[in-house]
């Protein structure tokens, strides 16, 4: 019976030591959760960068292989036109200010201040 008590005491101490290491020791559960969150955030960042890289790779391939992409870029970014083409630019009129309604009072006018003459010797 006495051996059982010692065995139970040793197992309780071992369990307490393992619990301490789980909650407070190196590599504890808090650190693991923090690292898992960092990994999830980095995975999300990597996916965004992977999509960006794929788009850039497709654009580079298109620029290397096709003339249509080069022509489009020259037209849109550099304003170039083909020989014999006429370029028309449509400029929209700026909206006119709304006329003052007759019910609204006109803003008060300030009279200009008189200028003091300065005597120069």
From Swiss-Prot:
Residues 1-6 are cytoplasmic. The gene is ftsB. This is Cell division protein FtsB. It is found in: Cell inner membrane. The keyword Manganese does not apply. It comes from the Bacteria. GO terms for biological process: FtsZ-dependent cytokinesis. Residues 96-115 have a biased composition (Pro residues).
């Amino acid at each position: 019976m006495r051996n059982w008590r010692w065995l139970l005491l040793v197992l309780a101490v071992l369990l307490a030591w393992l619990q301490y290491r789980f909650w407070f020791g190196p590599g504890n559960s808090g650190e693991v959760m923090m690292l898992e969150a960092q990994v999830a955030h980095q995975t999300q960042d990597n996916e965004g960068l992977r999509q960006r890289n794929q788009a850039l790779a497709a654009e580079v391939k298109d620029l290397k292989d096709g003339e249509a992409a080069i022509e489009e870029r020259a037209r849109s970014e550099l304003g170039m036109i083909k020989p014999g083409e006429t370029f028309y630019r449509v400029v929209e009129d700026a909206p006119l200010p709304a006329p003052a309604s007759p019910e609204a009072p006109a803003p008060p006018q300030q009279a200009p201040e008189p200028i003091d003459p300065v005597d120069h010797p």
